[in-house]
Amino acid sequence: MAYPLQLGFQDATSPVMEELLHFHDHTLMIIFLISSLVLYIIMLMLTTKLIHTNMMNVQEMEMIWTILPAIILILIALPSLHTLYMMDEINNPLLTIKTMGHQWFWSYEYTDYEDLAFDSYMITTDSLKFGELRLLEVDNRMVLPTDLPVRVLVSSEDVLHSWAVPSLGLKTDAIPGRLNQVTLTSMRPGLFYGQCSEICGANHSFMPIVLELVPLKYFESWSASLA
C-alpha cells in the first residue's frame, strides 16, 4: 500500500505490475537521455562563438533526426505492446468473480459457487478498530487464493466506476451494460488496498477495495464457511 510522502510506485505483487515497473524504468531512462542531449545542445548553442550562416541543407543531419526518433519510438513500442498483450491474456482461470459497482459500494459474486456473494461497504471512521486504515477498510473483503490465475468481470449497476488495485497493476472501468474482464495472479499473501478511480458522485472517495490474498487451503476453508 502507499505511505505518506512516498515517491514512486507501490511494491509489485503480480507479474503484470512487475512488467509495468520495468516498462516505466525503461521509458524514463530514454526520456532522461533525450532531455540530457537536448539540454547539452541548448547550452552548447548559448555558449559557443561559432555561427554558421551558410548552412541551408545538410542531408546527413536530416537523415539522423528522422531515423533516430523512429528507432527510439520502436524501442518504446515493443515493450509496451508486450506488456499490453500480457495484461489482456487470460489462460484457464481457476476462479471467476463478478464485480459490480454501485453508488457507493462494491458487490462481489463468486460465480463458481452457488451462493457465495456479498456487498462490500466502507467502514466509517467511528467504527474503525485500532490499526485499521481510515477510508480504506471494508466490512467484507474480497478473498482470493495466491499464485493462481483469477478472472475478474467488472461492470456497474448505475454510473461509471473504476475498479483499481495499484499494487497488482489493475484498473478496469465499470461501465453500465458492459462487462469488462481482467486477470490477476498474486505472488504473495497479504492485504492489498484500492479505491474507485472514476468520479462517480458525492461519495466517490468512500468506495475502497480490499483484497485479502491467502494460500489456497485457507481460501477453500473460507469459501466453505460462507457457501
Swiss-Prot record:
Coiled coil: none annotated. Residues 46-59 are mitochondrial matrix. The chain crosses the membrane at residues 15-45, 60-87. The keyword Acyltransferase does not apply. GO terms for molecular function: copper ion binding; cytochrome-c oxidase activity. It is an enzyme of class 7 (translocase). Component of the cytochrome c oxidase (complex IV, CIV), a multisubunit enzyme composed of 14 subunits. The complex is composed of a catalytic core of 3 subunits MT-CO1, MT-CO2 and MT-CO3, encoded in the mitochondrial DNA, and 11 supernumerary subunits COX4I, COX5A, COX5B, COX6A, COX6B, COX6C, COX7A, COX7B, COX7C, COX8 and NDUFA4, which are encoded in the nuclear genome. Component of the cytochrome c oxidase, the last enzyme in the mitochondrial electron transport chain which drives oxidative phosphorylation. The respiratory chain contains 3 multisubunit complexes succinate dehydrogenase (complex II, CII), ubiquinol-cytochrome c oxidoreductase (cytochrome b-c1 complex, complex III, CIII) and cytochrome c oxidase (complex IV, CIV), that cooperate to transfer electrons derived from NADH and succinate to molecular oxygen, creating an electrochemical gradient over the inner membrane that drives transmembrane transport and the ATP synthase. This is Cytochrome c oxidase subunit 2. It comes from Elephas maximus (Indian elephant). The gene is MT-CO2.
